[in-house]
Amino acid sequence: MNHKQLRLETPPLVEREYFTDPQHAVDRLRGLYDQAANFLTQHFLRALGGEAPQARYRAFYPEVRLTTTSHVKADSRLAFGHVTLPGTYAATITRPDLFANYLREQFALLMRNHGVSIGVGVSDTPMPVHFAVATRTDLNVPQEGVLDFSLRDVFDVPDLNTVNDDIVNGVAVPAPDGTQQLAPFTAQRVDYSLARLSHYTATAAEHFQNFVLFTNYQFYVDEFEAFARAALANPALGYSAFVAPGNQIIDSPDGEILPLPKMPQMPSYHLKREGSQGITLVNIGVGPSNAKTATDHIAVLRPHAWLMVGHCAGLRNSQSLGDFVLAHAYLREDNVLNDDLPVWVPVPPLAEVQVALEEAVAEITQLQGYELKRIMRTGTVATIDNRNWELRDQSGPIHRLSLSRAIALDMESATIAANGFRFRVPYGTLLCVSDKPLHGELKLPGMATDFYRTQVSNHLLIGVRAMEKLRDMPLSRIHSRKLRSFHETAFM
């Protein structure tokens, strides 16, 4: 069959509708998305069943659109929920079921701040069949050559022209008709990350919570599970379930979690709360590449904050093993984000996050004021991409570390903070000193065991408590203007 001659078949075309009720706009988005995804899924199933394709099947993502003609400025205190100039703004939307709360909130802000209606219709961006069937656990898109026809001749596949970070990186240009971006990510970019999250973490995107902890050791996972089970035993805390890799869900403190035959690269664990207001812990392993990968994909979920709670090398003789390090600046030698965010761009500390972390340390350790300085130091954290940096000539690295006033060194924190800055996700870092390589205290098995046994529990609890403090803040305070550039998307 010559698939180039196949006719094009699409779902029935529909007119754009305008809404002044956020919920009605979300409902319409869900209807359009389901229509497109079901259309592609049905034809894909027929093709898998051996039915020869009789057309090229194409469906489109839904989109939202608004137009404002007024130069009246929105409240200058707002970090999101408004556009800066008159014009037409649009965004393609995927998985409106997953993002329903987020979309309702963004629509309500735009309607209130600009007095406009939200248009919902069909975009001109094709939906790849891979993403249309992504929620079907019983379906897999076969590799090219497995079917007796070329998949790309019959269905649309992911397009790198729309799977990129141009919007958040500030290099996206308006559409030919002048329409500007309304959201930080395109629908295809979001779908790509949702698929990657499932692959890397072995949990579905709908389980991720708005407050994310990153760690680099299994010890923290064990403590998080213990905390989660205790939390489920106390309904007053408001947590409803705990999800482990493999989408294993328990809602009672004694629920069984089975070990997976094969663990994912970055296993994630989710202590759920109504409205996704719980806490997710991701064990990203070691290295800036993993840190970038995890944050690249979690960012599309638009979390309210993410924190790194891991271990570091203490660089000062006055530090002791087990001391905490609160990062207020970063020396970026991770070399994974240089093309997206040059190293000359400062990554500032965020006051709301810093205060939440410091208060959490004080609560858990029962130390206040000047006494708190005995076990916690605030300063610059250096992140490098060479775990065995100690084996090279020390003069260069040590000089740079001294010039930067660094007090700790690791392989993930600056990457996570820099990507938080890039993606407008509030970020922070609280590390625990596990070794002092410049002072002869290396990370050795026996030393590590004693150290982890006494320190990990407190460190994890501090991270959880800080997240609970951030959760209690208004969104307008957490998502501050510090992370916004000259021309920002209206969506958070």
Regions found by a protein language model. Name each.
Residues M1-A305, A313-M492:
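Accessory terminal and edge-of-domain segments that mediate assembly/interaction
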